């Protein structure tokens, strides 16, 4: 159940049902209207009942139904903001923002793309497309899709290795900088925890509720404890070239729409 491509729709339907159950309302929109297929809708309804019971007797406002840039998914009648995660493992993405936030610490990702020859490789192999060295993304979303689906072999052999080398060097330099400059490191971790970047200003939720649909378990992440212990974290090595660790946090430097092509990001995960 629940292929990766369906996660967004299934997750939103899950939020919607939790809100309906808390508010003692019948759902106005069917599972099919949310893009949820077959018996999956019945399964998600059962899961939503479990989470609503976990949250207790509250009314709520479903912020996710009204804006895609909300600070949380639900606001309870006592003012608590709730972020809901429906996952097969881990706890889902806590925060997603532009990699260009790192310019705050003197690191411009475009310098690495230029140094390792990504722009040159794109121009050489896709001369009929618009390649930008000024924009944050080398190509548009539409062209990214075209490259990945119509020219998969060229993309895999000519572009992906250059991006991997550039990102690896970027993250290694960041790690070295943060180890040598702890104030910058703690500032960065705080920015991600409080969801405050140069390009995206949100608010952290009061509570994060995680439903694991494979294990059928509910857990709550203690965000306050993570923040309290912030000064005890160190910048650690990881098992990949593209991420940093800080205590229970993992920061992954990747791309939203095709590696080396469109929307380079920082994703924050709580372990």
What is the meaning of each model-derived region?
Residues 1-72, 76-80, 85-271:
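Short, positively charged
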């Amino acid at each position: 159940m629940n292929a990766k491509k369906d996660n967004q729709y299934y997750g939103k339907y899950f939020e919607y049902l939790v809100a309906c159950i808390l508010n003692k309302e019948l759902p106005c929109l069917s599972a099919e209207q949310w893009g949820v297929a077959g018996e999956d809708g019945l399964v998600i309804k059962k899961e939503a009942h479990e989470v609503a019971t976990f949250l207790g007797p509250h009314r709520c406002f479903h912020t996710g139904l009204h804006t895609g840039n909300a600070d949380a998914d639900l606001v309870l009648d006592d003012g608590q903001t709730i972020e809901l995660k429906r996952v097969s493992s881990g706890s889902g993405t806590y925060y997603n923002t532009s990699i260009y936030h790192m310019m705050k610490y003197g690191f411009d990702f475009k310098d690495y793309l230029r140094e390792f020859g990504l722009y040159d490789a794109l121009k050489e192999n896709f001369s009929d497309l618009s390649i930008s060295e000024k924009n944050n993304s080398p190509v548009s979303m539409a062209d990214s899709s075209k490259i990945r689906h119509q020219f998969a072999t060229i993309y895999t052999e000519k572009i992906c290795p250059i991006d991997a080398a550039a990102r690896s060097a970027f993250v290694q330099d960041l790690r070295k900088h943060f180890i040598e400059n702890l104030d910058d490191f703690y500032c960065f971790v705080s920015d991600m925890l409080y969801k405050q970047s140069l390009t995206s200003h949100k608010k952290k939720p009061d509570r994060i509720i995680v439903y694991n649909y494979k294990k059928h378990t509910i857990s709550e992440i203690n965000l306050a404890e993570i923040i309290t212990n912030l000064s005890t974290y160190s910048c650690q090595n990881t098992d990949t070239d593209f991420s940093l660790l800080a205590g229970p946090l993992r920061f992954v430097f990747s791309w939203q729409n095709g590696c080396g092509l469109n929307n380079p990001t920082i994703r924050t995960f709580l372990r």
